[in-house]
Each structure stands twice: as structure tokens, then as C-alpha cells.
Amino acid sequence: MYPLVISKITKNTTKSVLISFEVPEAEKERFRFEAGQYLTLETKINEKLVRRSYSICSSIDEGLQVGIKEVPEGVFSTYANRSLLKNDLMMVAPPD
């Protein structure tokens, strides 16, 4: 897992966000991706470490992005939609 800064959060609908990550130059190769790959994100929510995987939904030209839809009682998806902010730090595993 590597700490990546959230460079942008776009509210697509009332229940979904597009999260863009800033990948440091030194990690560009590690975070290269192909269509169909996903990212595993990890953060602490209410003092518990929570990890979820989301499909990458961008082209290489758009940078590293995932879309997250809020689901009922979804701990991570609710947190992502309601609490994450631009410039927050998120632990992210390289694409898989």
C-alpha cells in the first residue's frame, strides 16, 4: 500500500463520486494500469481499518480514477461519498 493524495472528487450523482488520485512521479510505473484492473483502497473509519477494491474507471490519459456508489450500510462507500475531501491521503495498492 502506498499513500496517494486525492487530487479531485467529483460528485456524479447524489449517491456516487469519482475519486481522482495524484500519483507521484516516482510511483508512476508502479501505478500503470490496463483496462479491467482495480485498486484496493484502505483507510481508518471509526478506529477500524477498512479495505475495499474498486475498478479503475479512467483511461491512462485521464489519470488514476475510481467511481464509488454509496450503498445502504456500506461503511467504505458511505465514507467515500460523505466524508472524503480533496487533498485527503488514502492508502492505495497498485493496480491488480
Name each region found by the language model.
Residues 96:
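FAD-binding core/adjacent interface of flavoenzyme oxidoreductases
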Residues 1-88, 93:
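Ferredoxin-reductase
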